[in-house]
């Protein structure tokens, strides 16, 4: 008995790169399935990017409940999308993983604006830039050929760090001192 993986890995996110614990699309792009009789037609597919923080404000709106003033909502209600009345009033998404994990990902953050996504590694500040419309598998790093786009997205990401008071880590250093890294250092 047992599991044989002679033909390859037991699971795959292809054509997406990475998996759980990674900032690549294979780790953050997931189907979001909602059933709401009378609002969304069965089989409807929406390609607008959303995030898990959108779930809470969506449920509040569906239930007809106001958000509490002391609560800060990072997400946006998806009700206009579900009712096919419009989109979500947002064109930028952020992800922040300031830690090591057992899945092999790296501590870092990402920002997506339109079709472009920038990843920033916290260990060394290295960035990667991808055009997801043309490269869903994130194989062609455009950071060196599009420095103006890197600057634009990196500024958005660093401004967001300050806005949300993002936490950072002390990266592991092989055989040396542990040195902190923060944006702009």
Predicted ranges, named:
Residues 3-25, 40-44, 48, 53-132, ...:
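C-terminal cap/loop subdomain of S1 sulfatases and analogous C-terminal strand-loop tails that border
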Residues 29:
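Conserved nucleotide-sugar donor-binding catalytic segment
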Residues 32-34:
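Short glycine- and hydrophobic/aromatic-rich loop-to-beta-strand nucleating segment
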Residues 89-90, 154-173:
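Bilobed periplasmic-binding protein-like "clamshell/Venus-flytrap" ligand-binding domains
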Residues 132, 147-150:
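C-terminal structured subdomain/cap of oxidoreductase catalytic cores
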Residues 135:
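Intrinsically disordered, low-complexity polar regions and short flexible loop motifs
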Residues 141, 151, 161-162, 172-185:
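Extracellular/periplasmic ectodomains of large secreted or surface enzymes and adhesion receptors
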């Amino acid at each position: 008995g047992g599991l044989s993986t002679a033909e390859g890995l037991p699971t795959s996110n292809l054509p997406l790169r990475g998996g759980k614990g990674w900032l690549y699309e294979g780790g953050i792009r997931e189907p979001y399935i909602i059933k709401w009789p009378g609002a969304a037609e069965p089989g409807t597919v929406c390609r607008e990017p959303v995030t898990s923080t959108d779930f809470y404000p969506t449920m509040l709106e569906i239930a007809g409940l106001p958000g509490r003033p002391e609560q800060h909502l990072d997400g946006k209600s998806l009700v206009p999308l579900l009712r096919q009345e419009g989109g979500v009033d947002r064109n930028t998404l952020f992800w922040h993983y300031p830690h090591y994990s057992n899945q092999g990902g790296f501590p870092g953050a990402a920002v997506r604006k339109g079709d472009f996504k920038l990843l920033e590694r916290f260990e060394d500040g290295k960035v990667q830039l991808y055009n997801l419309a043309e490269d869903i598998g994130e194989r062609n790093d455009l950071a060196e050929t599009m420095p103006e786009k890197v600057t634009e997205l990196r500024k958005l990401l660093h401004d967001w760090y300050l806005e949300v008071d993002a936490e950072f880590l002390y990266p592991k250093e092989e055989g040396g001192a542990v040195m902190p890294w923060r944006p702009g250092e």
